[in-house]
């Protein structure tokens, strides 16, 4: 590590180099499936805009993937500012694309102009063939660099247009170089469902199989297939749609009163949102509001019973498709929608449609209401049972714990908050129904070398154990009180130290919680940036620089505030940045069987008292990677 830090030490990454250096920031590096999805999304965007009727996908025997569409064809003319063919610009330059405005596509899944260029950056070779204006063009790239100029290789009919992208993923960037065929087929089938009338084919040359999908009544047919043979309520799915100038929503849903595997899929501009988001929240809220209104109007709600979202949502199977301009996603992989206005839009549309349906189908509606009321009554009985058990047999909960009222492990969350002042703000900012808060005083004990029999001697550890309902070193999670246990510490070095000690506690003494995916670390922002009435939050210096760069195009001077700790945030800011599921950032603490030994070795080196020499050597070797507050 060099001792001098001057202008020579500053690196500027250009072209596709940022992607090749940090591929995990741009795609899922488990398998190359996400690269395939990016190319498929481009072709489907053409279908969504009404310019394509067919998309063909071929998985070749050498694990390369080819996607062919009959859309307009990528532009091949020279870009007026950059002086290179547009197709070359699209593949070689991050943030170059035709989907930033609404001139070319009303709705699209491409937002940042990085999708196809990421495919190019992480592939050994990419070949693009464009049919446009009666000519066939070809261009090729290797390792993100152009190796063959755009050239005309043939002619075709004027109406014969489209694009073919054939790419060979670079296995050095992925845990496994092989495509998951089942996931690929699931994505393609979903695209066909969401684009009624568009034909999508998949040819698998590895397993010698072919598949074709084309749905005329997309969502209804798809949901009906998924629950075929199971008793449903109603018999035929409740379907609806609404199309506005800048937003559109389609849905199909039904309930499985006797249980069964639920299909729960959501999409934004045909992009699958595996983790849901604001559109799914809006669907749930709209159904709840309509059902509450129906029950109150018909006076069928027993005294003391109030329906909650989980009562109407518990056995609901649904497919939801939202189309909107400028959607905001949590992360580049677009697995969760965070656009706040979408929740209100979907909720309002669904509430009106479901209210109408309930009053037009009274018999089925009353059966649904009975099912929801029975769920609410079970929930109330379970809550009373839990309270009675606490008073008679179990240890009293810690006094500083501000508990929640819900019991559903799919929703309940416990936040372990650094400091009393931040704990007070968090108690005001939380949703009392499903979020519990427990403040911690200072740094907890380093428990890495403490036996599980002795660890409860620490009052803080004892309180955490009682609050979550699990004994140290126990694999029995039947008494677990919260589905998510979230570590919430300051974004500075002290906060990171506390978060590390808490992670060590869970990895060493509550390993079953970690292995079952119950432990999370919240990522509070370090900066708040204000420009007029617009507010932005940044987690790191790099994010702050990115936001400021983006704001240069707007009038006014941005005001930057650095949070010294969680205690500096008011309850509204704390809710928006760290507690609200729609806008916060959580990182799940996970340990796979393969990583077990490696995780133990790393934690032991960092936390064991006898390993000080190893720590010093590690710091000398890796110290230049540290992000320090100086």
Swiss-Prot record:
Binding annotation for Mg(2+) 2: 490, 492
Family matches, as SMART domains: HATPase_c, TOP2c
GO biological process terms, semicolon-separated: chromosome segregation; DNA topological change
Site (Interaction with DNA): residue numbering on this chain: 443, 446, 497, 615
Cofactor(s) listed in the protein's UniProt record: Mg(2+); Mn(2+); Ca(2+)
InterPro entries in UniProt: DNA_gyrase_B_C, HATPase_C_sf, Ribosomal_Su5_D2-typ_SF, Ribsml_uS5_D2-typ_fold_subgr, Topo_IIA, Topo_IIA-like_dom_sf, Topo_IIA_B_C, Topo_IIA_bsu_dom2
Binding site for ATP: 5, 42, 69, 110-116, 334
Binding of Mg(2+) 1, residues: 418, 490
EC numbers on record: 5.6.2.2
Toprim domain boundaries: 412-525
Any Gene Ontology CC annotation: chromosome
Enzymatic reactions: ATP-dependent breakage, passage and rejoining of double-stranded DNA
Gene Ontology MF term list: ATP binding; DNA binding; DNA topoisomerase type II (double strand cut, ATP-hydrolyzing) activity; metal ion binding
Cofactor comment text: Binds two Mg(2+) per subunit. The magnesium ions form salt bridges with both the protein and the DNA. Can also accept other divalent metal cations, such as Mn(2+) or Ca(2+).
Keywords associated with the record: ATP-binding, DNA-binding, Isomerase, Magnesium, Metal-binding, Nucleotide-binding, Topoisomerase
Function: Topoisomerase IV is essential for chromosome segregation. It relaxes supercoiled DNA. Performs the decatenation events required during the replication of a circular DNA molecule.
Family: Belongs to the type II topoisomerase family. ParE type 1 subfamily.
UniProt subunit comment: Heterotetramer composed of ParC and ParE.
Name listed for the protein in its UniProt record: DNA topoisomerase 4 subunit B
Organism field: Salmonella typhimurium (strain LT2 / SGSC1412 / ATCC 700720)
């Amino acid at each position: 590590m060099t001792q001098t830090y001057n202008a020579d030490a500053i690196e500027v990454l250009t072209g596709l180099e940022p992607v090749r250096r940090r591929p995990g920031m741009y795609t899922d590096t488990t398998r190359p499936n996400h690269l395939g999805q990016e190319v498929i999304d481009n072709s489907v965007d053409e279908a969504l805009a009404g310019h394509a009727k067919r998309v063909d996908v071929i998985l070749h025997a050498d694990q390369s993937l080819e996607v062919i569409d009959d859309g307009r064809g990528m532009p091949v003319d020279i870009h007026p500012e950059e002086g290179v063919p547009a197709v070359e610009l699209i593949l070689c330059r991050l943030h170059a694309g035709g989907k930033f405005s609404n001139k070319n596509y009303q709705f699209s899944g491409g937002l940042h102009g990085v999708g196809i260029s990421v495919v190019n950056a992480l592939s050994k070779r990419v070949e693009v063939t464009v049919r446009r204006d009666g000519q066939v063009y070809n261009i090729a790239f290797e390792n993100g660099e152009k190796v063959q100029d755009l050239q005309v290789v043939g002619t075709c009919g004027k109406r014969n247009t489209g694009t073919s992208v054939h790419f060979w993923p670079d296995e050095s960037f992925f845990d496994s170089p092989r495509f998951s065929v089942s996931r690929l087929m699931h994505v393609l089938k979903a695209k066909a469902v969401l684009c009624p009338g568009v034909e999508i084919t998949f040819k698998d040359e590895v397993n010698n199989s072919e598949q074709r999908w084309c749905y005329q009544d997309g969502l209804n047919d798809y949901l009906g297939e998924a629950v075929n043979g199971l008793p449903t309520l109603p018999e035929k799915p409740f379907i609806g749609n609404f199309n506005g100038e800048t937003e559109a929503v389609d849905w199909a849903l039904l309930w499985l009163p006797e249980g069964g595997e639920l299909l729960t899929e959501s999409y934004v501009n045909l992009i699958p949102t595996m983790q849901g988001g604001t559109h799914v929240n809006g669907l749930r809220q709209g159904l709840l509001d309509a059902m509450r209104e129906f029950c109150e109007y018909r006076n069928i709600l027993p005294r003391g019973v109030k329906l909650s979202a989980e009562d109407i949502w518990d056995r609901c199977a649904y497919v939801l498709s939202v189309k909107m301009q400028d959607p905001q996603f949590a992360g580049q992989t677009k697995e969760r929608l965070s656009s706040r206005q979408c929740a209100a839009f979907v909720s309002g549309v669904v509430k009106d449609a479901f209210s109408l349906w309930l009053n037009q189908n009274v018999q089925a509606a009353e059966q649904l209401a009975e099912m929801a009321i029975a769920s609410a009554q079970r929930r109330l009985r379970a809550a009373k049972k839990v309270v009675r058990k606490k008073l008679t047999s179990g240890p009293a909960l810690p006094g500083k714990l501000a508990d929640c009222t819900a019991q559903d492990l799919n929703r309940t969350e416990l936040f372990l908050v650094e400091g009393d002042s931040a704990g007070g703000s968090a108690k005001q900012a939380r949703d009392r129904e499903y979020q519990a808060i427990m403040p911690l005083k200072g740094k907890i004990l380093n428990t890495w070398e403490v036996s599980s029999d002795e660890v409860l001697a620490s009052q803080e550890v004892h309180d955490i154990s009682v609050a979550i309902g699990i004994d140290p070193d126990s694999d029995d999670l039947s008494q677990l009180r919260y589905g998510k246990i979230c570590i919430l510490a300051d974004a500075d070095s002290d906060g990171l130290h506390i978060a590390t000690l808490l992670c060590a506690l869970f990895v060493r003494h509550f390993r079953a919680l970690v292995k079952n995916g119950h432990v999370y670390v919240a990522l509070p922002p370090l900066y708040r940036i204000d420009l007029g009435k617009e507010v932005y939050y940044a987690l790191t210096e790099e994010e702050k620089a990115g936001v400021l760069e983006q704001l240069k195009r707007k009038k006014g001077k941005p005001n930057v505030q650095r949070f010294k700790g969680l205690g500096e945030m008011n309850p509204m800011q704390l809710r928006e940045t760290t507690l609200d599921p729609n806008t916060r950032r959580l990182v799940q603490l996970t340990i796979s069987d393969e990583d077990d030994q490696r995780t133990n070795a790393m934690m032991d080196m960092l936390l064991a008292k006898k390993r000080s020499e190893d720590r010093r050597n590690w710091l000398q070797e890796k110290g230049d990677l540290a992000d320090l507050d100086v």
